[in-house]
Amino acid sequence: KRGRRIVDDDFLVVFNAGTYRPLRAWELSAQAVRETLETNLVGTMSATAAVLPTLLAQGEGAIALVGSVAGYGGLPKATVYGPSKAALINFAEVLHLDLSPRGIGVFLIDPGFVATPLTAQNDFAMPALQTPEQAAAAIVDGFARGDFEIHFPKRFTRALKLLQLLPRPLYFALIRRATGLYGVPP
């Protein structure tokens, strides 16, 4: 769905705070939940609340939230990260519904794997790994097109979206097979 395009003189706020710990379910802790949700969700929502009065008073501008394809569906090692990004995706959709009629653009950036210090923690294959430069180019292109959701690389992100249409048992089987991660602790 197309939204507001970003042009040179637009006011754009990008919320890109995030933290990630690769955790399996048996490694879950209340501390990991608090820290991840505080950064990935509460921090972003609070910062959005702080900037919204200015944008609404201006009647223009845009907000971009950085989610993740990990928010599309349950994935091994994304025990807290995935749900935090799923909530952020939902938040961006709500913002778009409420703010776009008032002249405020809302963008959701859902990258696949991008080579960063956070993804360097992963001990598994990361399909379609992007450089930060490739990610930046995809984001700028998405802003220019006025895409609500800017997701990349397309082949990878579209495959993950299609998996969500499958019955859950088939989804689980395919994810386990693709990742090689099964529910047995080491």
Give the predicted meaning of each segment.
Residues 108, 124-159:
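C-terminal helical subdomain
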